[in-house]
């Protein structure tokens, strides 16, 4: 009788349209219930039975119920699932398998089966890649996943590397392929094999892509030739190797090993500027005046060189600082090191006065055993030899940026626009409260940005610098020339690492077109999107492997009295994140560890401070002593506690 009743259908429709609904993201808790977060201010409680229909991170539409002044959300429609492709650990045996996603807030095992054609007998503890196939909000009875790839067995010592690479869908090994002979590019190569070129790298480096030669000129001028490995002499544009490099975009440097962009035969041998081996290069000859200015007679050319020495950062630094027992093997090499140090000094001063110089932060290096165990983590400060190479590379990249801009009008540029214009007024207001007066319009110009950065660098602490970081825009890769505010430069285009960066290979091809006087095609914008995405994934992979290794390294320190100096890097409502100064590990200090009385404690991300009873006790950039309270291996998180 009620079937097809238009009045009833209308009533149902009316009820449906009058029922309040909200769209948001599900946030799970460890206690079974959850919240629907609609925005920063508003969230709704999701009771445990309703949480069974959703997963942490799902974007959903929910019906909002009000009972006795308490609102709760009932999930109704899935907008975007949190999990699609994921990695996890397998539970159970062949006929009844489940997978627990490798995520701090996803604890439930999801029933699963192996995909057709996947020839692996999964067992308890195996790591796998899975894809979600069913979801309760899509009309399915329960969650269900399909195992699409076996990663490795549970006790594999190299789990951190293999799982991380699988998670981010990155290659595990070098690309296949060989380059048998050099291309005929119609380039005349200058023979510079008689000059005393040197490379300066880490002792373990095999893919040497830059060699340097310096010469004193009259009028207190210096000449610098930067010679760069020439992979585009072997790899034709559009070839199989070129396409593979284009996809990878960068060599992926992870703790303990790297996955090269090019086949190792090229990266570590044919293109590597090995000592006493003749190699083709793309080179830049520049003249530096007494104050370090790069003069206008910049010259790019093809050449052949023979590096006369593979020098090592620490040994060169020791020798220049008159320590250690290493000596250059000849007076000619010693003279090169002295001249390069002079160039470094001049360029450093020029950049300090006319551009911007980054504050030196140490690099942290993991020393690993044969089974991937962490033997030690050492901080490697940036010393004079590191700065020699850095200044030479920055100078060479400035030269390329100018030549490509003036001769072609395009290239692969690193662009950084400083502050987001939308944030300029808020930035000026914040600085004013700290006694720094800036013009909101001027700070958006390169000169205004540099002026502010120099004022911030002169501050006694880095606190104010850390406060304004959130107002900055991100660096981008662009085919259009543009300024790089972070470096304080009008234009910056890298070409000095073509073995490990595809964008540098593109710039090599463009520079070769300039050398030959040919027209060149502007790179497509899609390539910059691919490069930016790969850079993001590689950085995440490096961080993920690092987190795993830090957790392994500090596990035996949990619950002990071992003290670590730690710099506060971030403050949020829940506590503080700190970086251990000696090894670079990131740890979290929960708010209850800072002060037991929650109502007397204010942790403000906005101000970068922790206040107890109205007094500022901690602020971002403070260095404090901590002990390790706990290391949670399943989430690779380190919990620290301030030393009382």
UniProtKB/Swiss-Prot annotation:
Belongs to the RNR ribonuclease family. RNase II subfamily. Pfam families: OB_RNB, RNB, S1. Its EC number is 3.1.13.1. GO terms for cellular component: cytosol. This is Exoribonuclease 2. Residues 561-643 form the S1 motif domain. The keyword Hydrolase applies. Keywords: Cytoplasm, Exonuclease, Hydrolase, Nuclease, RNA-binding.
């Amino acid at each position: 009788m009620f079937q097809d009743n238009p009045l009833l259908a209308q009533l149902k429709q009316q009820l449906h349209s009058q029922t309040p609904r909200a769209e948001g993201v599900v946030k799970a808790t460890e206690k079974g219930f959850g919240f629907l977060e609609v925005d920063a201010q508003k969230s709704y409680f999701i009771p445990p039975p309703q949480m069974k229909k959703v997963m942490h991170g799902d974007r959903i539409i929910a019906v909002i119920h009000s009972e006795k002044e308490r609102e709760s959300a009932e999930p109704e429609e899935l907008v975007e699932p949190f999990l699609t492709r994921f990695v996890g650990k397998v539970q159970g045996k062949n006929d009844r398998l489940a997978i627990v996603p490798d995520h701090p807030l996803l604890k439930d095992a999801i029933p699963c089966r192996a995909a057709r054609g996947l020839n692996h007998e999964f067992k308890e503890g195996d790591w796998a890649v899975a894809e979600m196939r069913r979801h309760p909000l899509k009309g399915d009875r329960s969650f269900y996943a399909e195992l699409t790839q076996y990663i490795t067995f549970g006790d594999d010592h190299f789990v951190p590397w293999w799982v991380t690479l699988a998670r981010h869908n990155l290659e595990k090994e070098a690309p296949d392929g060989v380059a048998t002979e050099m291309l005929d590019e119609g380039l005349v190569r200058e023979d510079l094999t008689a000059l005393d070129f040197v490379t300066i790298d880490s002792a373990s480096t095999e893919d040497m892509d830059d060699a340097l030669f310096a010469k004193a000129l009259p009028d207190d001028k210096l000449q610098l030739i930067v010679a760069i490995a020439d992979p585009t002499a072997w790899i034709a544009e559009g070839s199989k190797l070129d396409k593979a490099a284009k996809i990878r975009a960068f060599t992926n440097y992870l703790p303990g090993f790297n996955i090269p962009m090019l086949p190792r035969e090229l990266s570590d041998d044919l293109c590597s500027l090995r000592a006493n081996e003749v190699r083709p290069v793309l080179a830049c000859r520049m003249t530096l005046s007494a104050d370090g200015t790069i003069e206008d007679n910049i010259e790019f050319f093809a050449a052949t060189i023979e590096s006369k020495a593979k020098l090592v950062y620490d040994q060169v630094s020791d020798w220049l600082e008159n320590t250690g027992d290493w000596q250059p093997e000849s007076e000619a090499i010693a003279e090169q090191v002295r001249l390069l140090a002079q160039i470094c000094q001049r360029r450093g001063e020029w950049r300090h006065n006319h551009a911007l110089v980054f504050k030196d932060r140490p690099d942290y290096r993991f020393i690993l055993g044969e089974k991937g165990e962490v033997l030690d983590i050492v901080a490697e400060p940036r010393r004079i030899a590191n700065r020699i190479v850095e200044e030479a590379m920055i100078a060479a990249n400035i030269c390329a940026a100018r030549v490509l801009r003036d001769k072609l009008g395009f290239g692969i540029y690193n662009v950084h626009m400083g502050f987001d214009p939308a944030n300029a007024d808020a930035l000026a207001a914040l600085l004013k409260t700290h006694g720094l007066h800036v013009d909101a319009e001027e700070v958006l110009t390169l000169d205004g940005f540099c002026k502010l950065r120099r004022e911030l660098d002169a501050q006694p602490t880095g606190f104010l610098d850390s406060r304004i970081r959130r107002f900055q825009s991100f660096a981008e890769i662009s085919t259009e020339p543009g300024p790089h505010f972070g470096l304080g430069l009008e234009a910056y285009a890298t070409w000095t690492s073509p073995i490990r960066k595809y964008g540098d290979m593109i710039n090599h091809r463009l520079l070769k077109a300039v050398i030959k006087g040919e027209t060149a095609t502007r790179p497509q914008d899609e390539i910059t999107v691919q490069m930016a995405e790969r850079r993001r994934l590689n950085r995440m992979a490096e961080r993920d492997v690092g987190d795993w290794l830090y957790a392994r390294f500090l596990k035996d320190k949990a619950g002990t009295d071992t003290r670590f100096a730690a710099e506060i890097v971030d403050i949020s409502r829940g506590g503080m994140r700190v970086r251990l100064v000696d090894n670079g590990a990131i740890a979290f200090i929960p708010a209850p560890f800072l002060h037991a009385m929650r109502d007397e404690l204010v942790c403000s991300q906005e101000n970068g401070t922790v206040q107890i009873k109205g007094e500022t006790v901690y602020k971002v950039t403070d260095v404090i002593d901590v002990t390790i309270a706990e290391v949670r291996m399943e989430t690779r998180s380190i919990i620290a506690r301030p030393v009382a």
